[in-house]
């Protein structure tokens, strides 16, 4: 079943006339055309008969024509009302309720004479949850480049270097490999500074005998990677090394349980139980992982409350962590493809 036919099925299920998609990444997912329109309207209209209409600034029309998109294009000037160029009466319209602003919704009511709205968010999330072979190949390459980032960062470690200096070195050096954008702000944290799960790199200088936490990802052809390694610099304290070994055991055990048909919450429980049994449960304050694709965090989440089942074609992260203030912060994260037989680990830097 194609992406568009899945949307049409949802239109029929909700007795709606069309779907209105405005999240730039979702528009790209359906059209193959990527734009960051800022305050301008950029939207895809999918009608029940399968017709697709892309609304975009007129200055982008030629780029759209050169893209894989084959539907109708409505290009508008900044001084024009886009809706006046494509007058429609749409009784019920499905929207991304998690994204669309109230102001845009009011424009739809007046522009398309919309009487009622439905939600298309979950349908799109479910579509994006299962990756095509092309998407998987791009994520695999993004993961390979993330491995290279860790290698670059580790090779730059030396006593006295600051966290920000390591971040800058990674992000500048990886450009030599064709990377123009990171998935998110690169995180490099030294010692007990890593006890803050989402800490911000600063001017802290590296000392001997502490751990260094790297959390980073790159974007390759619009698709993200996201990995974490915690690396020894010298010989950290006995407790810090004990924490590392517990996190590694939790991650390894969780990954080995991955296969289609297993509830996501069961994977979380495996890692969480190991950490709790070793006395560090209160220091593991977040879910085990999340979906990965066009965004570094996307549907679904690997959490203790998610009863949905793993399916072949999903790409998820597994990232247990223990964060003890004043002692250490350790997280280990890999990108995992769910296969028909079980799983494939896409990130490979040594642990």
UniProtKB/Swiss-Prot annotation:
CDD domains attached to this UniProt entry: APP-like (cd01092)
Keywords assigned: Hydrolase, Manganese, Metal-binding
Sequence positions that bind Mn(2+) 2: 215, 226, 333
Organism: Staphylococcus aureus (strain NCTC 8325 / PS 47)
Binding site for Mn(2+) 1: 226, 290, 319, 333
MF terms (GO), sorted A to Z: metal ion binding; metalloaminopeptidase activity
Family: Belongs to the peptidase M24B family.
Stated name of the protein: Uncharacterized peptidase SAOUHSC_01816
Transmembrane regions: none
Domain of life: Bacteria
PANTHER family: AMINOPEPTIDASE, DIPEPTIDASE YKVY-RELATED
InterPro entries: Creatin/AminoP/Spt16_N, Creatinase/aminopeptidase-like, Creatinase_N, Pept_M24, Peptidase_M24B, Peptidase_M24B_aminopep-P_CS
Cofactor info, note text: Binds 2 manganese ions per subunit.
Cofactor(s), names only, from the UniProt record: Mn(2+)
């Amino acid at each position: 079943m194609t992406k568009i036919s899945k949307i049409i099925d949802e239109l029929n299920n909700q007795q709606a006339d069309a779907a209105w998609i405005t999240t730039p990444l979702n528009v790209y997912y359906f059209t193959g055309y990527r734009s960051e329109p800022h305050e301008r309207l950029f939207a895809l209209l999918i009608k029940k008969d399968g017709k697709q209409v892309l609304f975009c600034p007129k200055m982008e029309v030629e780029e759209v024509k050169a893209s894989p998109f084959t539907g109708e294009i409505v290009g508008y000037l900044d001084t024009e009302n886009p809706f006046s160029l494509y007058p429609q009466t749409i009784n019920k319209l499905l929207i991304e309720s998690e994204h669309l602003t109230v102001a845009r919704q009011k424009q739809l009511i007046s522009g398309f004479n919309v009487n009622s709205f439905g939600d298309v968010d979950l349908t799109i999330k479910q579509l994006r949850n299962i990756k095509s072979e092309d998407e998987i190949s791009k994520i695999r390459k993004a993961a390979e480049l993330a491995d290279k980032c860790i290698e670059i960062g580790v090779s730059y470690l030396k006593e006295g270097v600051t966290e920000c200096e390591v971040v800058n070195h990674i992000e500048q050096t990886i450009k030599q490999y064709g990377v123009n954008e990171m998935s998110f702000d690169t995180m490099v944290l030294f010692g007990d500074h890593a006890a803050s799960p989402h800490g911000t790199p600063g001017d802290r200088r590296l000392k001997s005998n502490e751990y260094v936490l790297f959390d980073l990802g790159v974007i390759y052809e619009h698709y993200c990677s996201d990995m974490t390694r915690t690396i020894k610099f010298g010989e950290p304290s006995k407790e810090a090394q004990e924490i590392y070994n517990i996190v590694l055991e939790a991650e390894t055990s969780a990954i080995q349980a991955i296969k289609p048909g297993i509830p996501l919450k069961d994977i979380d429980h495996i890692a969480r139980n190991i950490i709790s049994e070793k006395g560090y449960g209160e220091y593991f304050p977040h879910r085990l992982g999340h979906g990965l694709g066009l965004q570094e965090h996307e549907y679904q989440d690997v959490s203790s409350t998610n009863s949905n089942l793993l399916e072949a074609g999903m790409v998820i992260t597994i990232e247990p962590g223990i964060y003890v203030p004043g002692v250490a912060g350790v997280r280990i994260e890999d990108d995992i493809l769910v296969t028909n037989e079980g799983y494939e680990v896409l990130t490979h830097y040594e642990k």
